[in-house]
């Protein structure tokens, strides 16, 4: 981690930039609904595509395997494609992404989500949707998947990039590191100005998915849509193991935020987005999976979790489940910051498996303190 705020700020500004190209899905054979293998499909943005799946916790060690946290380490160099395949540096679909960590819930587990995607990258091209990172709009990709498979469930995570979530993180971090001011007052106004339009577009994304499925011959009862919210990657101030004075949150913890801004993000922003997404789900008649508390106690800098060291190995029971802000930019890509890491994705995969077994009703997914990812459980929402 760095010794000066300026190196940290340079990395934080990169949070807003996505890079790389992803391969376009190959053509698939067409089959009548129900005739192909069963499938569960994930669509949307980085929180479901698998961004940050490269990491098993966070470590201050910058060389080698980073105390076992860096799954891209080959023994001599780093190869992100070991985790993200051909989508490395682009859509970043990891091998631990939510749908890939859900277990045997279908014959085919298909990840169409892409890091950095907005709602317009979900809409069909014929309806104004935009290609992204070399790939067709996700609804158009879904059409091919729906024709070749018996799709049973589609999980959607979208809206965060439309709201400018990366910009909010970057602003709040730079306000802590450089400007010594709070971000929550200005950023709340930014969110409030955007959120109605964003939620309308999230609702339209659901409509687009339905239109594709109907065109593929599916009846409403043949499949389910689950709209999910976002987990908080940072803890409340009372749960942060580092004090807000000094540089430990920046240089050691990777969570450079003021107490007031941390509390705003954890207890106002994340719940606001979740509540509005729940409203969209209700209006569109789809299930809602609330993930706001999924990483409770496992967030970056949380007191209940520990960084990985030479004497504290990576563990789903003790390590952080979200990627820190690597302000020196010596470990991986900055776009991985503030996303569920491999452990977090495995936990969210468990959530997906659990709601897959619940055909109706909204649910919240939480973790059990002191256990690994198998300790995830659902409650009524």
Identify the residue ranges that each predicted region occupies:
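Mobile gating loops/cap/lid regions near enzyme active sites that modulate substrate access
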Residues: 232-339
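A structural motif corresponding to the C-terminal end of an alpha-helix
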Residues: 98-109, 198-225, 266-291
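Conserved SGNH/GDSL esterase-like catalytic core that processes O-acyl groups on lipids
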Residues: 63-197
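Histidine-centered active-site loop/cap adjacent to the catalytic His
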Residues: 317-374
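Secretory targeting and sorting signals
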Residues: 1-32
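Short, solvent-exposed loop/turn and secondary-structure capping segments
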Residues: 34, 50-56, 121-124, 165-170, ...
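Catalytic nucleophile-elbow at a beta strand-turn-alpha helix junction centered on a G-D-S/GDSL motif
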Residues: 38-55, 60-61, 66, 70, ...
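Solvent-exposed loop/turn segments at secondary-structure junctions
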Residues: 46-50, 114-120, 160-165, 231-235, ...
